[in-house]
């Protein structure tokens, strides 16, 4: 069963939102596999509670099985379905799936949540050694209802094709091996692009951890960061309500210049590495992680624009948008988050270019006019911006 929730879809102002298309194409692929077993997905476009109520009227529902979701709305939604199910004597079973360790499974020696990544990751790895990943194939245990059902179309859902190409699910062993040495260079095809699959559950976090073990500690740590930010979301729910992790940063005075924000959004800041990242995001729904740090630092520290503005723009554009990771990344850049970059660390876009795109291959791809007269002048002077933010 899959439910397209109007509460979520109605908030997507871009009717060519690629995430809806990705989900629908993934469901179609799964439906082809189900057809081989003479069954289909049951897909609804409705309020989730109402969809289950209709399902209960149509079938003899005895139990519901789903996986944990950690965001605020999802938790409230699942609680309402659980409460309804109990009135119908339907058991509601929910399981951990999208993380390796959740909630309070990784705590400090004082039984408190970690707010710094390094000790968290150390304890995470210790627990993995005590609780190794075990395969539980389900094919021989599955019991399918014979049926043939059709999926809704993008048009029925109120959306249209995006034109964005979606990454595959595969990852080469050689890429994982070379990840530490190659990961910071955006012109290289050195990252897996699996984040969208992790976000929507089309690849298993457990299978990726198994691929990383003994091959790349750095690649494994990137997966652990996901668990870490889910951990922060669970233990410090105020971050899901527009507040800084470090609440004193909520008193920060921002310039919030709307003209400069629009220039940042459109990749017209006059800083080629920043503009390349934003244009890549706008065109593909993806941005290299090193460049994400550069553009976020630029918005917050060069332009003194509230990190929440950037967080919201990324939430709209990123194909792999995940609230906890997006929020954590933006608060890291702003210095307001847990284990954040220190406030005095201000990325110099020019030096970042020299280090990570010295041949300008990435910039030439996305900002081909950067050496032409029609390319905009920098909207802010780096040294002056650095002095201003540190004042």
Language model segments and positions:
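Charge-dense, low-complexity intrinsically disordered segments
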Residues: 13, 17-21, 166, 264, ...
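Active-site-proximal binding-pocket segments
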Residues: 190-364
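A short alpha-helix capping/helix-coil boundary motif
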Residues: 7-11, 30-33, 59-62, 131-139, ...
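Glycine/tryptophan-enriched, flexible segments
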Residues: 88-90, 111-249, 352-391
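Trp/Phe/Arg-rich N-terminal binding region typifying the photolyase-homology
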Residues: 1-128, 215, 279, 391
């Amino acid at each position: 069963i899959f439910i397209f929730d109007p509460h979520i879809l109605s908030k997507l102002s871009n009717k060519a939102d690629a995430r809806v298309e990705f989900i629908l194409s993934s469901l179609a692929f799964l439906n082809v596999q189900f057809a081989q077993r003479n069954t289909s997905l049951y897909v609804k476009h409705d309020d989730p509670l109402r969809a289950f109520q209709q399902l209960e009227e149509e079938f003899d529902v005895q139990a519901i099985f789903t996986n944990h979701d950690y965001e605020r709305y999802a938790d409230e939604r699942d609680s309402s379905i659980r409460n309804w199910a109990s009135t119908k004597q339907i058991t509601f079973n929910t399981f951990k799936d999208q993380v390796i360790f959740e909630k309070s499974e990784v705590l400090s020696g004082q039984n408190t949540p970690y707010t710094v990544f390094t000790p968290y990751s150390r304890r995470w790895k210790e627990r993995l050694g005590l609780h190794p990943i075990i395969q539980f194939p389900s094919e021989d245990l599955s019991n399918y209802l014979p049926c043939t059902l059709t999926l809704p179309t993008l048009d029925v859902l109120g959306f249209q094709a995006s034109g964005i190409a979606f990454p595959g699910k595969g990852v080469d062993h050689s890429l994982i091996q070379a990840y530490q040495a190659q990961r910071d260079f955006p012109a290289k095809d050195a990252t897996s692009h699996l984040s969208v699959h992790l976000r929507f559950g089309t690849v298993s976090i457990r299978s990726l951890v198994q691929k990383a073990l003994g091959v790349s500690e750095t690649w494994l740590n990137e997966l652990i960061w996901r668990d870490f930010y889910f951990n922060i979301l669970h233990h410090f729910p105020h971050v899901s309500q527009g507040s800084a992790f470090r609440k004193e940063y909520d008193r920060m005075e921002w310039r919030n210049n709307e003209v400069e924000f629009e220039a940042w959004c459109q990749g017209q800041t006059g800083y080629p590495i920043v503009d390349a990242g934003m244009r890549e995001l706008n065109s593909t729904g993806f941005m290299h992680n090193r460049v994400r740090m550069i553009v976020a630092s630029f918005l917050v520290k060069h332009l003194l624009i509230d990190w929440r503005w950037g967080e919201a723009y990324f939430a709209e554009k990123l194909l792999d948008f995940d609230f906890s990771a997006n929020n954590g990344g933006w608060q890291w850049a702003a210095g307001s988050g847990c284990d954040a970059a220190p406030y005095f660390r201000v990325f110099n876009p020019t030096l970042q270019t020299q280090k990570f795109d010295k041949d300008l291959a990435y910039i030439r791809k996305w900002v081909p006019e950067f050496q032409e007269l029609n390319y905009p002048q920098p909207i802010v002077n780096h040294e002056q911006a650095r002095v201003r933010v540190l004042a």
